[in-house]
Regions:
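Catalytic cores of soluble, metal-dependent hydrolases
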Residues: 3-112
């Protein structure tokens, strides 16, 4: 399933969370996050910057909305740290994403 950055304008973070849950349900899932879903203001160091992308807060909200989902694993792609700003915006955003996903993963065991 692919969620495009522009969908946030139409259905908001809650709509995106709902769309993901409807697709995944109670099944185990693997999450792949492309950092270029974030606007270059929040993550400029990527191979394909997406103007009009999400804020870091919006992405964190969506990930937190997956609380209870059985995530098997995740990857975070397109982080090009050599191109990051001195403030390391992309690196910090990437760390936030990983932290949020790991938080969801440790709270929801895959089996009981």
């Amino acid at each position: 399933m692919i969620v495009e950055a522009r969908e946030i304008d139409e259905i908001g973070t809650e709509g995106i969370i709902k769309k993901i849950w409807e697709r995944v349900g109670n099944n185990p899932a693997y999450l792949s996050v492309d950092i270029d879903v974030l606007d270059p203001a929040f993550a400029p160091a990527t191979g394909t910057p997406e103007t009009g992308g999400w804020s870091t807060r919006e992405l964190r909200t969506i990930i937190r909305g997956l609380d209870g989902m059985k995530l098997l694993g995740m990857d975070l792609v397109e982080v090009a740290t050599p191109y990051d700003t001195a403030a390391e915006h992309t690196t910090m955003a990437a760390a936030d994403v990983i932290y949020e996903v790991l938080s969801v993963m440790v709270k929801t065991p895959l089996s009981k």
